[in-house]
Amino acid sequence: VTSYTLNEVVPLKDVVPEWVRIGFSATTGAEFAAHEVLSWSFHSELGGTSASKQ
C-alpha cells in the first residue's frame, strides 16, 4: 500500500467568505481506485479567536 501525506498552509482570509465548506476529491482517470482520507485536521484563526476540528 502506498501512502502519501499532503500538508499545505493556505491563507484563505482574502479569497473566501466567512462561512465555507471543505471537501475532498480524487481521480485516476478511466481506472478504478479506492481513495481514503484516513485523517485530517483544520485550524482557523479569525480576529484573535481560534477554532480547531480534527
Curated annotation (Swiss-Prot):
PROSITE patterns: LECTIN_LEGUME_ALPHA. Coiled coil: none annotated. One of its GO terms (molecular function) is carbohydrate binding. It holds the Pfam family Lectin_legB. It comes from the Eukaryota. Keywords: Lectin. The keyword Mitochondrion does not apply. InterPro entries: ConA-like_dom_sf, Lectin_LegA_CS, Legume_lectin_dom. Tetramer of two alpha and two beta chains. Belongs to the leguminous lectin family. This is Lectin alpha-1 chain. The lineage of its organism: Eukaryota, Viridiplantae, Streptophyta, Embryophyta, Tracheophyta.
